[in-house]
Amino acid sequence: MAKDIKFREDARARLEQGVNKLADTLKVTLGPKGRNVVLDKKFGSPQITNDGVTIARDIDLEDNYENMGAQLVKEVATQTNDVAGDGTTTATILAQAMVNEGIKNVTAGANPMIIRKGIQKAVDRAVEELQKNAVSVEDKESISQVASISANDEEVGKLIAEAMEKVGKDGVITVEESKSFKTDLNVVEGMQFDRGYVSPYMVTDNEKMEAHLEEPYILITDKKIGNIQEILPVLEKIVEQGKEVLLIAEDIEGEALATLVVNKLRGTFTCVGVKAPGFGDRRKAMLEDIAVLTGGQVISEDVGLELKNADISMLGRARQVTITKDDTTIVDGYGNEEDIQKRITQLRTQIEETTSDFDREKLEERLAKLAGGVAVVEVGAATETEMKEKKLRIEDALNSTRAAVEEGIVAGGGTALIDVLPSLEEVQADGDESTGVSIVRRALEEPVRQLAHNSGAEGSIVAEQVKQKGTNIGFNALENDYTNMLDAGVVDPKKVTRSALENAGSIAAMFLTTEAVVADLPDEDDNDDGDMGGGAPGMGGMGGMPGM
C-alpha cells in the first residue's frame, strides 16, 4: 500500500489537531460541574457517560494524521486507567497542554531533544514533591471522600467505604447490575465459591432451599466419589461424634450419592456434597486454598493419599457453612493463621509475577477469599443507559479508592499540581532544558483552569489565586470558593495524580521529538466504483427487452 509522508512543522501540526480534538471532547467532563458526552452505538441506545477512558476508546478520526495524534493521547488515558484506574481526563489535559506549549517552542527553533530532558527533569521533581505532600488514608471517612469525589456521588462514596471496611483493602469488591432501582451493598463473609449442593434432598432449610451446617467436618478431595465404601470409615467416626459433614469432591454419584441422601432423609446424619470449584490446575489450587482455610488436607493421589485411608485428622473444620443450589460459603474456617498468611503471601507473589490479565484476576479473587471475603455493589437505575453510566462511575470510584489506600491522597481539584510549582524553581536546567521545565510548569496549571472553566469561572484568574494561597488551599468547584481541600474532603489519590503526570510527560516528549509522520494513502479501490457505473449504460440493451 502506498504511503504519504509529512515532515517537521506540517507533521506536528496535523498530529496536534488530533490531540486537540480528542482532548477537547474529554475536557468538558472534568470536575463536579463537568458535562456528559453521548456516544453513538451501532447496536442499542446511545451511551451517555463522563468517564474519560470510555470516551477516548470510542474516538477514531477520519483523517489519518489527526487520528494518529488522537491515538497517542488515547494511550495516555488508557495507560493511566490501567495503572491507577482513574484520572484519565486529567492525564489527557496535561498531555494536551504540554504538546501545545512544546510545539510552539519547537516551531520557534528550540531543540526538541533538549526540551525532552527538561520535561523529564520537571516531571521527576514534581512527582517527588507530590510524594512529600501525600497523606496516608486510614479511616473510613477518608475512603468515603475519595470515592465520593471520583463518582461525584456521596452515597456511592459511603457504599464503597462500607464495603472496604467489611472486606478489608485486599478483599474483592465487585460491581454488578441490580434488578431493582436501588443501589445496594451485599457482603459475603468468608470464602464463597460457585458450586452448590449435588442434590436438593440435602437441604436443611426447605423454605429457602439452603443447607446450613454448624461446625461441620469438611472432606476435600479431587477424586469422584462413587463407592460409599471408600468414605464409610471416616463417615462412621464423624457420626459417632454427632457432627455434620461437607464433602467437596470432583463429583458425587451413583451408590455414594443415594446412600448419603437416604441417610439424610432418615435423619441418621447430615451430609451435604458439593462439586469442587474451578477446572484443571486452578481446581487443585482452589481446593488447596479451602484446605488451608479450614485446617484440612486435600486427599489426592498427587500427594499419595487415598479416600479409603482418609482419617478424621485430615478433615477441615469451619464455624458455619451455607450451601445454596449455586454457591457454597465457608465462614470462619479453623485453619492455622500462620498457614493462611503464608498462602496469602504466596498468592501475592504470583499476582506480581503473572503477565496474564485473566490469571491475575483469578488470583486476586482467590486472595480476597482467603484474606477477607467478597463485597458486591449492586447498581440500580431506572433505565439501562443510566445504569451503565452509573456503573462506570462506581468502578472508577472503586479504582480511585484502592489507589488512595495504596499511595495516599493529595489535595484535589488540581490543587496538588499547583502546589508543586515552587519546587520546579529548584530544577537545575538552562537553555532549551529550562524551556522543557517551563512547559511542565504551564501544563500543571491546566487542570485547575479547566475545572474553573467547567464551573463557569475564569480559569486564568482562579489559577493565579490558587498559586498565591497556601499549600492545599484550592478552588472548590462545587461551592465556587477557595478552601483547604483536605479539610473539605476534596481529595485525589496520589497514585492517580502521579500516573497522569508521568504518562502525559512521556507522550509529550515523544510528540515533540517527532520529525516525520507516515500514513496510508486512501485505497485506490474507492475510485473503482465510477468505472462500474460507466459500464451500466452498456446494459441498456436490456431496455430493448420489450422489443424482443
UniProtKB/Swiss-Prot annotation:
It is found in: Cytoplasm. Residues 522-531 have a biased composition (Acidic residues). PROSITE patterns: CHAPERONINS_CPN60. The keyword rRNA processing does not apply. Coiled coil: none annotated. GO terms for cellular component: cytoplasm. Residues 532-548 have a biased composition (Gly residues). It catalyses: ATP + H2O + a folded polypeptide = ADP + phosphate + an unfolded polypeptide. Its EC number is 5.6.1.7. SUPFAM superfamilies: GroEL apical domain-like, GroEL equatorial domain-like. Residues 522-548 are annotated as: Disordered. It is an enzyme of class 5 (isomerase). Keywords: ATP-binding, Chaperone, Cytoplasm, Isomerase, Nucleotide-binding. One of its GO terms (molecular function) is isomerase activity. ATP binds at T29, L30, G31, P32, D86, G87, T88, T89, T90, G413, N476, A477, L478, D492. Gene3D superfamilies: GroEL (3.50.7.10), GroEL-like equatorial domain (1.10.560.10), TCP-1-like chaperonin intermediate domain (3.30.260.10). Its main location: cytoplasm. One of its GO terms (biological process) is protein refolding. Together with its co-chaperonin GroES, plays an essential role in assisting protein folding. The GroEL-GroES system forms a nano-cage that allows encapsulation of the non-native substrate proteins and provides a physical environment optimized to promote and accelerate protein folding. Forms a cylinder of 14 subunits composed of two heptameric rings stacked back-to-back. Interacts with the co-chaperonin GroES. HAMAP family: CH60. Belongs to the chaperonin (HSP60) family. This is Chaperonin GroEL. It comes from Natranaerobius thermophilus (strain ATCC BAA-1301 / DSM 18059 / JW/NM-WN-LF). The gene is groEL.
